[in-house]
Amino acid sequence: NLKAPAILSKEFSKCVVKGNNNIINIIDQRVFKLTPYFFSYTLSKAGLYTMTKTSAMSFAPRIRVNGIAPGPTIKNKRQSVAHFKKQYLATPLRRQVNVNDICNAVDFFIKNRSITGQVLALDSGQSLNWQTPDILGGKEWRKIILKFSE
């Protein structure tokens, strides 16, 4: 989640001279709403968030660097359909993030040449929501979280 983007960004920066060059990192909304769960994953994505900001400064003006921090988009392999639905229904917009939404955000970053060093929370408002089940707690939710954070 961090090493490969760092290496690719560094090598890409050596290859470009001028033009409309972009690096768009896929981060995670968890960098905006930290929890103690998924520790190593969240830590690596927080590192990618910081790398996005510092790379934008380092690579300018040749390369613009931005990020997208999606919320619930696709059910992970260890997650039940019911759990995934519960997760996205707990967001303020009560909908999962559509892959087309992410593609549109990539297009937005490419077309808007005055944007660099920004990370867009594309998460149906999940990073704003302080009353999600993982924050509210409860024995059932804690068991589910611990199962997925192994």
Spans of model-derived segments:
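Acidic active-site catalytic centers that drive phospho-/nucleotidyl reactions
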Residues: N1, K45, N66, D101, ...
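Conserved mid-core alpha-helix of short-chain dehydrogenase/reductase
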Residues: K3-E11, K53, Q96, D101-N104
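Catalytic loop of short-chain dehydrogenase/reductase
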Residues: K3-I7, V17-G47, T52-A60, P72, ...
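Short glycine/proline-enriched coil/turn segments at helix->beta-strand junctions
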Residues: K14-G19, A60-R62, A82-H83, K111-R113
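Glycine-rich "substrate-gating" loop/helix at the edge of Rossmann-like oxidoreductase active sites
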Residues: F38, P92-R95
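Conserved Rossmann-fold SDR core element
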Residues: Y49, F59-T73, I115-L122
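A glycine/serine/threonine-rich, flexible loop-to-helix segment
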Residues: G67-T91, W130-S149
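C-terminal substrate-recognition "lid" of short-chain dehydrogenase/reductases
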Residues: N98-L122, S127-L128, P133-D134
